[in-house]
Amino acid sequence: MRIPIKDVTPEIGHARIAGWVHEERDLGGLTFLLVRDRTGILQVTIPKKKVTPEVLAAVKEATRESVIECEGVVKATEKAPGGRELVPDMLRVVSRAETPLPLDVSEKVPAELDTRLDNRYLDLRKPRINAIFQIRNACLRAISEYLWDNGFTQVQTPKIVAAATEGGTELFPLAYFDKEAFLNQSPQLYKQMLMSAGFDRVFEIGAIFRAEEHNTVRHLNEATSIDIEMSFANEEDAMHVLENVVASAYQYVADHCGDALATLGITDFKVPTVPFPRITYKEAIEISTAGGEPLVFGDDLSTAAERIVGEKMGTMYFITEWPTSTRPFYTMPFEDRPEVCRAFDMMHPRMELTSGAQRCHIHSLLVEQIKAKGLNPDAFEFYLNPFRYGMPPHAGWGLGAERLVMTMLDLQNIREAVLFPRDRHRVSP
């Protein structure tokens, strides 16, 4: 049976492995193959006078990135990666790679991001890139486990919808038989409907689609959103869950992803301390203005403003009490100052990671707010009906998985944090 490379030790004595030829060195009487699988790299040493003709023929056939299978004796040696090598008594080429390769998986020859994404199947073989997705997987596992442990039910909501979640024109239309339909921007409306259904606490990890024309290092047109909604809760309750979700993801990565972090060269990985600091929107625009990026009440925070405030805060933090005019129609305003609402953003010093709020659960107020945004309540009848028959107060948020991983690992482009990115210029591969 095949053994993962990370589990191959001299104590095993004899092992069978399979993987890709990462590098090859021919020193005359000796040939060295570095064989890579998902778990690591192992040196396969071929003493030409001591192996069979079949092994020698297979070694000659094997090109870089060919898939091979080999079996042999495992020996300890200080000169090999990981302090061990395998001397094969069987080696065969399972799938020979053509030459030249369109991309150097060993990364000795650098490549532009577009070239890498065009050949993503090869790019993902790189140990450094693979490490990003091992950590992403760990984050989603930790987040799911935290939410399950805290009484949340995982759900899957429709991705084909008849109306915009948040209004606006940032929608991808679909040819849906004889009806008008769109790819969903967010599970927001359905999460809220589940509060009326008595689900109490729900979460979803799924795709969202936004037809934004941004072409930046922090925007995607298809992304993965981690969403929650919880009944009988306000914005403070939602922030409490959020900061603990994020801290638990960091802690899980710190505890279980040491090898992946080392592959990425991260030696000072820090788990954020909870609770995260909180500042109001008013305080944020004052900090931005003092830092040279003037803002007035009602302005959204620009990239420059986020940078100025983030440098001052120096850690993850919340911005609370946003102008009602800047938030979607389903956000609950403060009763005594309706121009301000119970919304928050969770910020990394580099950028926004999450938006959330206490939601409006009062049918008449919700209809008013839909109209105030220039939208037609009739288009939201399916959503509004549950509010007529007993809707508890509720709150929630949506966290971008790619932005979480991007900031956690200090990646320079969000496309690095998704397997096959979709932006305004890329729909393949």
From Swiss-Prot:
ATP binds at R210, A211, E212, R218, H219, L220, E352, G400, A401, E402, R403. Residues 188-191 are annotated as: Aspartate. GO terms for biological process: aspartyl-tRNA aminoacylation. L-aspartate binds at E166, R210, S355, R359. Its EC number is 6.1.1.23. One of its GO terms (molecular function) is aspartate-tRNA ligase activity. It holds the Pfam family tRNA_anti-codon. Binds 3 Mg(2+) cations per subunit. The strongest magnesium site (Mg1) is bound to the beta- and gamma-phosphates of ATP and four water molecules complete its coordination sphere. It is found in: Cytoplasm. Keywords: Aminoacyl-tRNA synthetase, ATP-binding, Cytoplasm, Ligase, Magnesium, Metal-binding, Nucleotide-binding, Protein biosynthesis. It catalyses: tRNA(Asx) + L-aspartate + ATP = L-aspartyl-tRNA(Asx) + AMP + diphosphate. It comes from the Archaea. Mg(2+) 2 binds at E352, S355. Homodimer. HAMAP family: Asp_tRNA_synth_type2. Belongs to the class-II aminoacyl-tRNA synthetase family. Type 2 subfamily. Aspartyl-tRNA synthetase with relaxed tRNA specificity since it is able to aspartylate not only its cognate tRNA(Asp) but also tRNA(Asn). Reaction proceeds in two steps: L-aspartate is first activated by ATP to form Asp-AMP and then transferred to the acceptor end of tRNA(Asp/Asn). This is Aspartate--tRNA(Asp/Asn) ligase. It comes from Methanocorpusculum labreanum (strain ATCC 43576 / DSM 4855 / Z).
